[in-house]
Amino acid sequence: MADIYRFPKFSYEDNGTVEPLPLRTGPDKKAIPHIRIIKVGVPPKHGVRYLDLLLLGFFETPKQTTNLGSVSDLTEPTSYSICGSGSLPIGVAKYYGTDQELLKACTDLRITVRRTVRAGEMIVYMVGSIGAPLLPWSGRLRQGMIFNANKVALAPQCLPVDKDIRLRVVFVNGTSLGAITIAKIPKTLADLALPNSISVNLLVTLKTGISTEQKGVLPVLDDQGEKKLNFMVHLGLIRRKVGKIYSVEYCKSKIERMRLIFSLGLTGGISFHVQVTGTLSKTFMSQLAWKRAVCFPLMDVNPHMNMVIWAASVEITGVDAVFQPAIPRDFRYYPNVVAKNIGRIRKL
């Protein structure tokens, strides 16, 4: 069993909403490009901005033509057919220009895509035609980028391996960063196990503007019968001295003194941001890597949910602190289905 503390509404109501990406088509029946920028924290009103960008679009392959070798092959533009949708995260950089200049530069990119595999399925991106507005990101764009296929492609199995594939950018998601920065809790700290401790996890409840059942994300009915989605993230451990007794009130008081503020961003699709505005113990602060603002991209927490809702309207409707006994150190984590040294099964 776990004890729950519900955060007050004011802790997430200011920046807890993301507007949807409008999907409109032009005379050629192609989607009209659109840029969506959301502010996290208090960015400067004028001048320089720090932007985290995610490019969204369609994977396309050239259509096969019947009149091979004709003169029209040299004069007519190549037509493409859509074989999937996906994204390309390009990171954070300092940007001085306008949103429309950035959108134009992103849609002009030539992005070639290849589906491959290492320990798991991967998507390889190679980028060309980098315009001036994207020069702050050029250090990353000029190098080949590899991502987990299940995080950046909605249906990687639909991407052919024997054809040329391109990513046509249609939408640009941007997170404008102010006092809040993008810092993730390192995996070694998130997986930390301390004896005599209580794990503080956050249960985040979302309301979206689309139906997600047909795409494999089942909602949960709340007390009012409304369909909601939720996910959990780990914040840290509360540890007491040997002999001290844990109580729900003690854990609640520790959380209340932190004065946490929650917001939604667009890092990797949809991201959940936590800012500490109150006091923290040194033990808890060290578990946050000495950061007072941390980011939880849904791309890392729940990739499939992220891909289903990253273009929809999303709103935080509740955040709960869940106090659970920390997992004992002697419990073993099995990241693979094939376990070592069991019968005739052996790992190389």
Swiss-Prot record:
Keywords: Host cell membrane, Host cytoplasm, Host membrane, Host-virus interaction, Membrane, Phosphoprotein, Viral budding, Viral budding via the host ESCRT complexes, Viral matrix protein, Viral release from host cell, Virion
Post-translational modification: A large portion is phosphorylated in the cytoplasm, but not in virion. However, this phosphorylation is not essential for virus replication.
Any matching Pfam family: Matrix_Paramyxo_C
An annotated Gene Ontology molecular function: structural constituent of virion
Keyword Phosphoprotein: yes
Keyword match Transmembrane: no
Family, similarity comment: Belongs to the morbillivirus/respirovirus/rubulavirus M protein family.
Subunit and interaction comment: Homomultimer. Binds to the cytoplasmic regions of F and HN proteins. Interacts with nucleocapsid. Interacts with human alpha-tubulin and beta-tubulin. Interacts with host ANP32B.
Notes on the domains: Late-budding domains (L domains) are short sequence motifs essential for viral particle budding. They recruit proteins of the host ESCRT machinery (Endosomal Sorting Complex Required for Transport) or ESCRT-associated proteins. The matrix protein contains one L domain: a YLDL motif.
Protein name per the record: Matrix protein
Source organism per UniProt: Sendai virus (strain Enders) (SeV)
Gene name tied to this protein: M
